Amino acid sequence: FTETVAKMATAFDMSAEVAGDAMAKLANVYQIPIANIDKLGDAINQLSNESPAKASDIVSSLSRVGGVAKGFGLTELQAASLANAFVSLGKPPEVAGTAINGMLMKLSTVDKQGPKFKAALSAMGMSAEGLKKAIATDAQGALLGFLQT
């Protein structure tokens, strides 16, 4: 783990302490064996290399949304991609994390939202019940469908 974190710290332009703490927390949230945490690190590095987002900002945002994203049904790799998308829009990781958490929490309780929310869904060609079922079946697919509408 120490060697992996040292490599991540260098690649992510973060201190080893910050990288280690963030990755340990993510490993705990997503129940990733420490021996496999390098796969998440590799994915974050790849996302950073292919987007305007810095790896350290992706890690920071991902650390803020890990629990909510997991509860929503996203894997760690899917959550990392979502964090990357928001950070790539030029938002600071704190803002990206807050926005992602808010969106996922609203969608997680879609069936409990008020009439205005349900009317907006209807205008998008969706229903609260249908979206709730879609999230339960395929969280990432439902989220992509919602965002693409």
Give each language-model segment a name.
Residues 1-149:
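Amphipathic alpha-helical interface segments used for oligomerization, scaffolding
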